[in-house]
Amino acid sequence: MQTADIRNAWLTYFGDRGHTVVPSASLVSDDPTLLFTVAGMVPFVPYLTGVVPAPFPRATSVQKCIRTLDIEEVGRTPRHGTFFQMNGNFSFGDYFKEQAIAYAWELLTTSEADGGLGFSPDDLWVTVYHEDDEARQAWKRIAGLPDERIQGLGRDTNYWHTGQPGPAGPCSEIFFDRGPAYGADGGPATDDDRYVEIWNLVFMQYLRGAGTGKSDFEILGDLPKKNIDTGMGLERVAFLKQGVENMYEIDQVRPVLDRAAELSGRRYGADHEDDVRMRIVADHVRSSLMLMSDGVRPSNEGRGYILRRLMRRTVRAMRLMGVDAATFGELFPASRDAMKAAYPEVSDDFDRISRLAYAEEETFLRTLSGGTTILDVAVGETKAKGGERIAGDTAFLLHDTFGFPIDLTLEMAEENGLTVDREAFDRLMLEQRTRAKADAKSKKTALADLTVYSEFRAAGETRFTGYDELETGTTILGLIVGGRSVDHAVAGDIAEVILPETSLYAESGGQEADAGSIVGQGFDLEVLDVQKPVKGLISHRVQVRSGEVGVGDAATTVVDADWRRGATQAHSGTHLVHAALRQVLGQDAHQSGSYNRAGYMRLDFAWNQALSSETRSEIEDIANGAVRDDLRVVTRVMPIDEAKQLGAMALFGEKYGDTVRVVDIGGPWSRELCAGTHVSSSAQIGLINVVGESSVGSTNRRIESLVGREAFQDLAVERAIVSQLTSTLKTPREQLPDRIADLMQNLKTAERRIADFEAQALQQRVPALLAQGSRVGAVTLIQESLGAVRSADEVRQLVTLVRERAGSEPVVVALAGDAGGKPTVIVATNQAARDAGAKAGQLARAAAAVLGGGGGGKDDLAQGGGSDVSAIGDALTAVRQALAS
């Protein structure tokens, strides 16, 4: 099953059973105690704890999560990932223990064809809290599990609580047995490599008191309502269902791993350390992509620091495989393509994401180049002296001068068998923070430190001139490189430029920063981003394209006119769509978020159900009516109280000062507080084309539109497609829907006939294969290379047919095929062969090793694959040799 199939099966199953399907919340958690959403339950905590009444009795979701606590384990175990998706089903005082167990067992063991996940009951084990006899009996009654496959464990592993007084309760975990090839018998209590946890059911029923540790606390009594909170790791189930060895090889992650292998010239599976590095790349690129799609930006503090660390570990992993050049331009598109089906926003917002990623990579490549040399020297000197610890001042120098995060220094030291004098490092950091002066040897750490901007902010606020002009003459007030104030920057440098005035708009209010340049005598700076790092100060992140720029140089800020035109069209279009929404849906449909860039706008609004196509069309028509009416756009600055008296709309979550800017479009038709850039009349927007509407939470919807040139281009593409269809199908445009429906029905009929013909063709091949069996010890081996096949399923069907027709004598069937350049070997055994010691999983792994890949399965049926089609013959020989041994 593909990851998307597992996700859909989950949501469909629970949705059909009365659960409200809740879209994933952002990775940026609303919980102030969390940097990220770390578990599927996080968005539901207010309901589970009773702080907020649940708006539904039961719910289900597939939640995006980020955890970096075990970041060093990424790539080294089959199931540690920093980004993962958690399937969850929740009950808020509705059903409880028995029903939760029944749901879990039914979904797991129902066949894929009938909407389940298709696990064999024989492969599943469960654990329960050792005092929870109710859960044990429920498992025996519902699943028919014997006592030996229901293991009772203590509070440390099978009792959930928050770590403080509050809700608590026993839990029951479900495990998949990967077979004896992965570890010893004995169940989950003995081996977590062989027995992989796939689902945890938490029975939240008690109130716990104070205590320390995982198990030292008192149960005070029952909760007023009993809740259910369950979590299934989507990636874990995916790697088990896809027959691969770990989560890095599933369909949503493997494309990045393969691209890393191609770029490095290394072969996955050939070297353990290279394999770990490729997995790190695959995991961290995906995590970085998803974080940036939810608005996180690389920085030196908080969430941004975690993102920066992931990206820098990726760069370093590629360098350790011999790739010194930039690779994000290849890796991030591969991850985008793998994830966009489940999360379209990663594709929609990829221009912004990629600009951030590529700039971050270029900066760190330069950091690595200087810092690695110093660290290598320090490692060599330490070892030459017989030492075991790198000096703290060396680690401090790397951090302070070269921007090396301390965790990276610690990691690189450990790889060389050394430690770092962390105590001395921390002491130097403390001394640095207490010094007022900031000379070259004692610059403050970039971690969570904004003091580098203090001297510039003291000179006054940056004046934004971009409302009135696209080019502004100014002077270079300050330059920042690597978190330090410098006097100059040269070609190739990534720097921040501070100016007393600028025509370039800094990202805010949902509007993306302007594109453009800063030019002067002898230098040309490309603007990568414009931000407000501290209140009142605008910082321009630039790359020096040519020349050398210095503090005090005269300069001109130049806004990309096409970009600004598109951005103003999008922002004014957002105001029109917002006003149209409220006209159609009522005043409760207020804006809860927005994003605007040239040609595109996205508006989130409070609403709890999908919009019908008729409603969408009505909103679009009203907004475009305002465009056609050529409404005048007027901006005014006034006290906030006066603005409110005029009815200007203040948006939820935005913070306003005493003086605000009011944007009127057609007078009261649309009146909002807004600091963004806008057209001067609504007709300049050109056209608003609503292209999407979706859910972004239980009480919010999102409407997406193209505006201006992009809207016309999109309609032109649609018109061309319709024209091509009418020509190809020789059908008038108004009859196209019926004609296409007829063609789809004919296609389904043809596909059924083809499937019947293929089944007959497979049946006809069976006698010839049966006739060519040869004896290997006590077993008859039937093996053949089938050449080109449509898919691995075709090979599997033929293997199964041959085994069924082979009779009761011991028989092993091993057939191989080339499925579009991917070699596949399927091995099957009958009962007599298994009694004689033949195991399909072992034989498939022997073949896969020759093919340069992996394999596995059960004793009766297993699959191996790889990348080397030319080795299929040798792989079949390996099966024969493994069987003979």
Curated annotation (Swiss-Prot):
Belongs to the class-II aminoacyl-tRNA synthetase family. CDD domains: AlaRS_core. It is found in: Cytoplasm. One of its GO terms (biological process) is alanyl-tRNA aminoacylation. Its cofactor is Zn(2+). One of its GO terms (molecular function) is alanine-tRNA ligase activity. Catalyzes the attachment of alanine to tRNA(Ala) in a two-step reaction: alanine is first activated by ATP to form Ala-AMP and then transferred to the acceptor end of tRNA(Ala). Also edits incorrectly charged Ser-tRNA(Ala) and Gly-tRNA(Ala) via its editing domain. Binds 1 zinc ion per subunit. Its EC number is 6.1.1.7. SUPFAM superfamilies: Class II aaRS and biotin synthetases (SSF55681), Putative anticodon-binding domain of alanyl-tRNA synthetase (AlaRS) (SSF101353), ThrRS/AlaRS common domain (SSF55186), Translation proteins (SSF50447). This is Alanine--tRNA ligase. The gene is alaS. The keyword Cytoplasm applies. The keyword Nuclease does not apply. One of its GO terms (cellular component) is cytosol. It catalyses: tRNA(Ala) + L-alanine + ATP = L-alanyl-tRNA(Ala) + AMP + diphosphate. It comes from Clavibacter michiganensis subsp. michiganensis (strain NCPPB 382).
